[in-house]
Amino acid sequence: SFCASGNNDDRDQCQIGSNHGFVVHGLWPQYERGFPSDCPSPIRNPPASAMRDAEGVFPDLGLARYEWRKHGTCSGRSPSEYFADVRRARNKVEIPSELEQPRSAQRMSPLDIQRAFIDANRGLRPGMMAVACQRGMLQEVRICLSKDLRDFRPCPEVTRQACRSQQINVPPVR
């Protein structure tokens, strides 16, 4: 839905045939109210060795660099450790089969999307995730993990921002 939401056709992940379904668009420390971003760091641009750790996790390395600057700098981790954490978090979450590679647009309720993720992920419950939408379209699925990334955890700050629409469009994979 990122690709359908605006002028993003020039992004690698939005090219026809890129075959990206759900992708990581961030991992950040979450406070009970809000989150830190753009923290002071001696490393603004991750070294090439760290960028290799980001390959295959983010849809493109430009997004990986951006996410490091915005959120990774607040993680208390080195760029390589941050990207390894992102990979661990991504590997923790199973994308439901019906949403993994949709070939045609679907209409679903946010609750059905939430249920699909809960069914696919042992230990995930309502209150530990939120389906976000914008202008009637799925925007993202936000899932909260413990600090050590081993368990799902409640996150009222995130769930308060969940989509309230009855039905939303889920775009196909490009």
Language-model features: locations:
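Domain-level detector of nuclease and nuclease-like folds
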Residues: D9-R174
